[in-house]
Swiss-Prot record:
The record marks 56, 64 as: Interaction with RNA. GO terms for cellular component: cytoplasm; mRNA cleavage factor complex; nucleus; paraspeckles. This is Cleavage and polyadenylation specificity factor subunit 5. The keyword Nucleotide-binding does not apply. Homodimer (via N- and C-terminus); binds RNA as homodimer. Component of the cleavage factor Im (CFIm) complex. The gene is nudt21. It comes from Danio rerio. One of its GO terms (molecular function) is identical protein binding. Residues 103-105 are annotated as: Interaction with RNA. Pfam families: NUDIX_2. PANTHER family: PRE-MRNA CLEAVAGE FACTOR IM, 25KD SUBUNIT (PTHR13047). The keyword Nucleus applies. Residues 77-202 form the Nudix hydrolase domain. A motif (Nudix box) lies at residues 110-131. Belongs to the Nudix hydrolase family. CPSF5 subfamily.
Length: 228
C-alpha cells in the first residue's frame, strides 16, 4: 500500500503537479453546497397563450454561419445563453422546449449583445420569447449555470469542453436553470409550440433532440427536486 506524502498532490500529470497550480484555491473558500433543492410545480399550474411569430435572424444554416464568421471578425466569439425550465407531471420532471416544425427542438434563449451580462441577457431573451403581452413583468429566477458548450469552428458540432489545439472558439453557449414560480402565464410565438419533454425521453436521445438537450438528464441529476 502506497502513501502519498502530505505535501504532495495526488492529482495531475506528471505526478505531483496540480493542474490548477493553486490558481483557484484561496483561504476564503466558500463552503461546498452538497445538495441543491429545487421546487417543481405541475404543468397544469401554467397557462400558455400565443403572440406574434418570432423568426430566426438567419434564413438558413449557411446564412447563420456566414453571419457568425462576419461578426467574429468584428467582435470575437459569440456568446449565447439558454434557459432550462422544468415542470413535473405525475412526479416526473419535464423540460419545456420550443418546437419548430415536426423535428426541431430548442431551449429558449439566444445571443448576448456585446458586453451584456449573462443573467440579465437571458432574462431579456426569455421575456422576448415567452414573456406575456399584458405588460406584467415576468420574474425570471436564474441562480444556477448547469452547462457550458463550445463551438470550435464555423460548423454545427459543439462540445462540452474546448477541443485540443483550439485557441479561439467561435461560440460559447451557457445553460442556466430557470426556476419557475408556482404559477405563471407564458405567451408562445405562433410559429412555435411549447412542449414538455420528460427526462426519460431526452436521455441518450441525441438523434431526436441533439447532444445538448439530450445531456440535460445528467446535468440535472445533481439537484434534489421537490414535487409540489
Amino acid at each position: 500500500m502506497s502513501v502519498v506524502p502530505p505535501n504532495r498532490s495526488s492529482t495531475g500529470w506528471p505526478r505531483g503537479v496540480n493542474q490548477f497550480g493553486n490558481k483557484y484555491i484561496t483561504q476564503a473558500t466558500k463552503p461546498l453546497t452538497l445538495e441543491r433543492t429545487i421546487n417543481l410545480y405541475p404543468l397544469t399550474n401554467y397557462t400558455f397563450g400565443t403572440k406574434e411569430p418570432l423568426y430566426e435572424k438567419d434564413s438558413s444554416v449557411a446564412a447563420r454561419f456566414q453571419r457568425m464568421r462576419e461578426e467574429f471578425e468584428k467582435i470575437g466569439m459569440r456568446r449565447t445563453v439558454e434557459g432550462v425550465l422544468i415542470v413535473h407531471e405525475h412526479r416526473l420532471p419535464h423540460v419545456l422546449l420550443l418546437q419548430l416544425g415536426t423535428t426541431f427542438f430548442k431551449l429558449p434563449g439566444g445571443e448576448l449583445n456585446p458586453g451584456e451580462d449573462e443573467v440579465e441577457g437571458l432574462k431579456r431573451l426569455m421575456t422576448e420569447i415567452l414573456g406575456r403581452q399584458d405588460g406584467v413583468k415576468q420574474d425570471w429566477v436564474i441562480d444556477d449555470c448547469i452547462g457550458n458548450w463550445w463551438r470550435p469552428n464555423f460548423e454545427p458540432p459543439q462540445y462540452p469542453y474546448i477541443p485540443a489545439h483550439i485557441t479561439k472558439p467561435k461560440e460559447h453557449k451557457k445553460l442556466f436553470l430557470v426556476q419557475l414560480q408556482e404559477k405563471a402565464l407564458f405567451a408562445v410565438p405562433k410559429n412555435y409550440k411549447l412542449v414538455a419533454a420528460p427526462l426519460f425521453e431526452l436521455y441518450d436521445n441525441a438523434p431526436g433532440y441533439g447532444p445538448i438537450i439530450s445531456s440535460l438528464p445528467q446535468l440535472l441529476s445533481r439537484f434534489n427536486f421537490i414535487y409540489n
